[in-house]
A protein has these predicted regions:
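Repeat-solenoid scaffold signature
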Residues: 19-55, 121, 129-132
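Extracellular and organelle-lumenal recognition/adhesion modules and their flexible linkers in secreted
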Residues: 58, 62, 83-214
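Structural motif corresponding to the intra-repeat A-B loop/turn of tetratricopeptide repeats
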Residues: 2-5, 39, 99, 135
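A structural motif in tetratricopeptide-repeat
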Residues: 5, 15, 22, 56-57, ...
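Alpha-solenoid helical repeat scaffolds
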Residues: 1, 13, 26-32, 46-47, ...
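Structural signature of tandem alpha-helical TPR/SEL1-like repeats
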Residues: 4-17, 39-48, 70-78
Length: 214
């Protein structure tokens, strides 16, 4: 409030005092870091921002975005200024895919311990996967999906047709990009039939019942 009213010096003193009284309060560190950055005190600013990320990983994503803007995508400088913690790496991976820097995205992602990919940073992995799908980097997306998959999840593999015999149910909605999908429209009619089969327990039936051939 003081800074907005023109008292930047008073605002700085108040924030420094707050950080002194509550050194582990991440919101104070984050606010102080942004204040220092606006004052052109870059070195001090990112020390505070880094401390905010250390105590609250929710600040990792905005810290990455901010550092990216300040250092124009220089990853060495970004890591130097906000650190290379696992939380930062997990945020950098999907962010870098948006910048089409796939190799660097995977370098950061693959440095995260395998178990943490499935647990602590699974949500980041899902974001990473979705960004790769959007970028049409399907092989890489499949790699990430296998890394974050739960034991009960479907298992997809490169060069392998999933559910080729339709012994598993076809999802009517929310199917993976690597799974079978039912398209819109009324033709053909698609169903699974246990009475007509060549192997297994059932076959896929396609019924064309259109008077105009469409």
């Amino acid at each position: 409030a003081r800074e907005r009213s023109g008292d930047a010096v008073g605002a700085g003193k108040a924030l420094l005092k707050a950080a002194e009284l509550a050194p582990n309060y991440s919101e104070v560190r984050w606010t102080l870091g942004n204040y220092l950055l606006r004052q052109g005190r870059e070195e001090e600013a990112f020390k505070e921002i880094s401390k905010a990320v250390e105590t609250d990983t929710r600040y990792a994503n905005p810290a990455v975005v901010l550092a990216w803007q300040v250092y124009d995508g220089d990853l060495n400088m970004i890591a130097q200024k906000i650190g290379d913690s696992t939380a930062i790496k997990a945020q950098l991976s999907p962010f870098l895919v948006k910048q089409k820097r796939f190799d660097e995205a995977f370098n950061f992602w693959n440095s995260i311990p395998d178990e943490e990919k499935k647990t602590t940073y699974r949500k980041n992995g899902e974001d990473f996967y979705n960004q790769l799908i959007e970028a049409k980097s399907f092989r890489n997306a499949l790699t990430v999906q296998s890394q974050i998959a739960k034991p009960e999840d479907e298992k997809f593999a490169v060069g392998t047709l999933f559910n080729p015999d339709f012994e598993q149910n076809v999802k009517p909605a929310n199917a993976s990009v690597f799974d079978w999908k039912l398209g819109g429209g009324i033709q053909p009619q698609i169903s699974l039939d246990a009475s007509q089969k060549h192997a297994g327990t059932r076959s896929l039936i396609l019924l064309y019942n259109s008077s105009d051939g469409k």
